[in-house]
Amino acid sequence: METNSCLKMQVALTLLPKFNTQKYLTFINRCGGIEGFFHEKTHAFSTLLKEYQLSFSDERKSALKSAEEELKNLDLYDIRLCSVEHSNYPFLLRQCEDTPLVFYYKGQLVTESLPYLAIVGTRHASERCKIRVRTILKELAERGHRLVIVSGLAYGIDITAHLSSLTQHFPTYAVLGHGLNLIYPAPHKNIAENILRQGGALLSEYPCSSPFIPQHFLQRNRIIAGLSQATFVAESALKGGAMATAHIAASYGRDVMALPGRPEDIFSKGCNELIKQNIAALVEDSSDIACLLHLKDKKSPPQQTSFNFFDTGDQEKQVLKILTQQGCTPIDELSKNTRIAMNELIALLLKLELEGKIVSLPGKNYIIS
């Protein structure tokens, strides 16, 4: 068990200026370990800084003092630390030159040998793409696969990936760009709690005292990519966090995958470009992901057939029949034609959408998927 003093020094490392992790580790070893690093005399420390061509002021004392407050936060918010020298530090993340020396986490780090897949994309995800993400994860589960899904808890594709993981009982990691004493965006707090309840984790390289800075969200993308065997871009414009994550993953030598989209769709242009530049493999369905991750089916693959009305309840049959005959239909008209109470109809439509049978469109309209 680590001493309070050792934990304090690990926290203090996260409060010092950032530079190359491998250089930091070599530097610490030259000082005789983390304790030597923090207690090396000022003159000798300055000499080492010059030798390593580093120029930051000696902030070790102030970092140690601030770390005392951070330790209180660890207890208060049930947050733990993982150092790059710990045996449970994620293997793939450790291989990255810019891996964090220490990161904070809540929940459980998966010790089981499972493939890690990052799923990223725009915050303005289309309903059609969200359904495709849900369907892909559902089919992977039906094939008997179990994965760790990594994303960033943001709106759009991120939260769809986390929710779909929870539905399929996959552990999922949410990598955050702020301290773990808060959840952003706030409406996702309940989902974050469900992630913890279902054996996943929230991760951040930032201490609780770290201010909420937009640049942190770009920095955290390298951790999403670094944790993962492959990064899957579901939907993205030409610029944005998902594209940055894809390029970082490629720079690490990891596989990148993307869903193609219509050329005129602004949030398909990024995916199409990744495929066109041979940065990403084209993904059409779950079998493509299984192939790229070298997964062997443990169960019979799901049948790629359209749904059968006779597999559903009477109310579902009514809704599906109307949508098949009429095409795009507003919810008010569905309620009128089926005589299903509005509150029951809303629940039924959500169920059908999650099953990938229908798609919701703006203005509370619905069509067959």
Task: Describe every region a protein language model picked out.
Residues 1-88, 274, 355-357, 362-369:
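Short, small/acidic-rich helices and loops at N termini and domain boundaries
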Residues 2-4, 83-369:
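Glycine-biased, small-residue-rich flexible motifs in mid-sequence functional cores and linkers
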